Amino acid sequence: VQTSHQSNKAMEHVKQIPSLGVVVPRVLSSKTF
């Protein structure tokens, strides 16, 4: 539950910052939770 909550916050930040929209997904994909 906590991980999904963090991802939701991350998605909100991604919407605000387009650059993170490319970096965040790569980090999340590289780090398999």
Curated annotation (Swiss-Prot):
Compartments where found: Virion; Host nucleus
Induction entry: Expressed in the late phase of the viral replicative cycle.
Disulphide linkage map: none
Secreted recorded as keyword: no
Keywords, alphabetical: Capsid protein, Host nucleus, Host-virus interaction, Late protein, T=25 icosahedral capsid protein, Viral attachment to host cell, Viral penetration into host cytoplasm, Virion, Virus endocytosis by host, Virus entry into host cell
GO cellular component term of the entry, any: host cell nucleus
GO process terms (BP): endocytosis involved in viral entry into host cell; virion attachment to host cell
Location, primary (coarse class): virion
Annotated function: Major capsid protein that self-associates to form penton base pentamers, each in the shape of a pentagon, situated at the 12 vertices of the pseudo T=25 capsid. Involved in virus secondary attachment to host cell after initial attachment by the fiber protein, and in endocytosis of virions. As the virus enters the host cell, penton proteins are shed concomitant with virion acidification in the endosome.
Family classification: Belongs to the adenoviridae penton family.
More info: All late proteins expressed from the major late promoter are produced by alternative splicing and alternative polyadenylation of the same gene giving rise to non-overlapping ORFs. A leader sequence is present in the N-terminus of all these mRNAs and is recognized by the viral shutoff protein to provide expression although conventional translation via ribosome scanning from the cap has been shut off in the host cell.
Subunit-level organization: Interacts with the fiber protein (via N-terminal tail region). Interacts with the capsid vertex protein; this interaction binds the penton base to neighboring peripentonal hexons.
Protein name: Penton protein
Species annotation: Canine adenovirus serotype 1 (strain Utrecht) (CAdV-1)
